[in-house]
């Protein structure tokens, strides 16, 4: 931790005398644990709203799930049911505002998607019809239009693809850092590496959190801790059932422009950033034989040669659809851990056991970060509960809809 951050954190640690339960927005002290894109968005919205925010993370900004995400901003057919699709639509819409306000480069242009199976293609067409009913400008694009959409992509025998024109993609590490910088501009303290270790409660009200950096007096604690399933139990007194799965993200060196859309092809996801780098994401999870070595949830491969092998494997799949990518070299190949609440929906809200602890855990964190940050900050600062978030509360029945 650099000297400037240490001095600022020392100031945050020294604050005393503010009442917990009656804290106003101007005086409310909030510790946000987790400096991924969701935690960063919440921190920015809180700081902008007048709260006194400290952001901690045991490693640093975007070092866990947000680093290893494909970073597809979308409200596609997979966002079910209607209430979750609407939330995702608002997330996409808020990205337009956020990108402009914080100068975050988003590559808009939409996504195209198709499957190998005829049955799955038929179901995709049905799902796109539902998307249209839900207000999306999505459509099935016939084969004769595909070359104009993506001249470099080989579609093989497929005769239609789904086009979702509102989708975009972003560099999640850059976006997270822009949000944190903006939060700091509103007075937030950023402390990395700084691990959450304990919380102190008096009369059921939060008094402070204990970290590897010291004791921080706080009125609220936000757990934006992604795939760390043990932390809600320890700090919020509640279990969040989730299946945390690894996925590999490979990022090439800058290449000539060759993709216009996010391409979701059988076995591989691809998109090209504005700087020319192509991001590859795999669709399949790790084989059972890898479970032992993945038990510690590493973000890095044990050897560079192993990372290179995975990159080349993904490149071979990508070459089937994008021959021009042949010969690409990778800058980064790493493992991302996806927090997947069992019903597939975000967890947003105060713990019923410890109301001063607010949970914000979700898959599709990139798509939802702007709207989740806005809603979470509003609930924390005002003390109100937004009816729209009732279906996402941490004490819901996760078995009603089991997706993961």
Predicted regions: what is each one?
Residues 256-354:
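Active-site lid/adjacent beta-loop-alpha segment flanking the redox-cofactor pocket in flavoenzymes
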Residues 2-23:
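N-terminal export signals
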Residues 319-404:
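C-terminal catalytic lobe of FAD-dependent flavoproteins
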Residues 219-260:
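Central helical "cap/lid" subdomain
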Residues 93, 104-107, 116-186, 191-192, ...:
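Flavin (FAD/FMN) cofactor-binding and adjacent substrate-gating region
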Residues 71-149, 267-269, 277, 298, ...:
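Dinucleotide-binding Rossmann-like beta1-alpha1 core, especially the glycine-rich loop
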Residues 30-54:
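N-terminal Rossmann-like FAD-binding beta1-loop-alpha1 element of flavoenzymes
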Residues 48-66:
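Glycine-rich FAD pyrophosphate-binding loop
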């Amino acid at each position: 931790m650099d000297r400037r951050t240490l001095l600022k954190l020392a100031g945050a640690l020294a604050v005393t005398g503010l009442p917990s339960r009656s804290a106003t927005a101007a005086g409310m002290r909030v510790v946000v644990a987790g400096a991924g894109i969701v935690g960063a968005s919440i921190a920015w919205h809180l700081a902008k709203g007048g709260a006194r925010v400290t952001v901690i993370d045991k490693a640093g900004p975007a070092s866990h799930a947000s680093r290893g995400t494909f970073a597809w901003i979308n409200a596609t057919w997979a966002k079910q049911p209607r209430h979750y699709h609407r939330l995702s639509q608002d997330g996409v819409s808020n990205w337009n505002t956020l990108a402009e306000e914080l100068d975050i480069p988003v590559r808009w242009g939409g996504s195209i998607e198709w499957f190998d199976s005829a049955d799955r293609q038929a179901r995709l067409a049905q799902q796109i019809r539902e998307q249209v009913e839900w207000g999306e400008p999505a459509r099935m694009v016939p084969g004769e239009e595909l070359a104009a959409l993506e001249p470099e992509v080989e579609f093989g025998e497929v005769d239609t693809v789904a086009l979702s024109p509102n989708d975009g993609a972003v560099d999640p590490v850059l976006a997270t850092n822009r949000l944190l910088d903006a939060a700091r501009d509103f007075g937030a303290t950023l402390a990395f590496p700084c691990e959450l270790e304990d919380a102190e409660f008096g009369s059921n009200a939060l008094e402070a959190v204990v970290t590897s950096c010291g004791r921080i007096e706080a009125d609220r604690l936000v757990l934006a801790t992604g795939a760390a399933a043990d932390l809600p139990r320890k700090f919020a007194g509640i279990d969040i059932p989730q299946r945390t799965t690894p996925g590999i993200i490979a990022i090439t060196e800058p290449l000539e422009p060759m993709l216009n859309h996010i391409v979701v092809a059988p076995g591989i996801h691809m998109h090209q950033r504005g700087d020319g780098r192509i991001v590859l994401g795999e669709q399949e999870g790790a084989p059972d034989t890898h479970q032992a070595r993945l038990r510690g949830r590493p973000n890095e491969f044990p050897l560079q040669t192993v990372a290179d092998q995975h990159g080349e494997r993904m490149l071979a799949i990508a070459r089937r659809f994008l021959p021009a990518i042949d010969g690409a070299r990778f800058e980064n190949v790493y493992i991302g851990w996806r927090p997947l609440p069992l019903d597939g929906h975000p967890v947003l809200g105060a713990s019923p056991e410890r109301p001063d602890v607010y949970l914000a855990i979700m898959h599709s964190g990139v798509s939802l970060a702007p709207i989740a940050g806005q809603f979470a900050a509003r609930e924390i600062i005002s003390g109100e509960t937004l009816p729209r978030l009732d279906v996402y509360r941490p004490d819901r029945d996760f078995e009603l809809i089991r997706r993961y």
